[in-house]
Amino acid sequence: MKSQTVLISIFIFSFFALHQCMQMDVGEIEGSNKISIGKCVPAQCSVSFFKRDCWCCFRDQSMCSKTQKECESNPRCPPLKF
């Protein structure tokens, strides 16, 4: 009896998901699959082991800044291209 209930629940959920996909516009689907990755990543610049206290350029880890805003605005840090 439990397995039948589970199968019916999965079946209903699948129809709901299919219904939602059919209502979406093609532009929404194409726009939602793009990943946005910043130019900088949090890094460890001090002695403490678990503390991430600075931001470094993703491509060149030697260029670091105290804040993410400073790192993102650095013209020497190239943006990622896919």
Curated annotation (Swiss-Prot):
| Signal sequence, start to end | 1-23
The chain's disulfide connectivity reads C40-C56, C45-C77, C54-C71, C57-C64
Keyword annotations: Developmental protein, Disulfide bond, Signal
Any single GO BP term: suspensor development
The record's note on what follows loss of this gene reads: No visible phenotype, due to redundancy with ESF1.1 and ESF1.3. Simultaneous down-regulation of all 3 genes by RNAi induces embryo abnormalities.
Task: Report if keyword Repressor is assigned.
Answer: no
| A Pfam family | ESF1
| Expression sites (tissue/organ) | Expressed exclusively in ovule embryo sacs and in early developing endosperms.
What superkingdom does the record give?
A: Eukaryota
Q: What does this protein do?
A: Maternally-contributed central cell peptide regulating suspensor development and correct auxin distribution in early developing embryos.
The entry sums up its family as follows:
Belongs to the MEG family.
What is the recorded name of this protein? EMBRYO SURROUNDING FACTOR 1.2
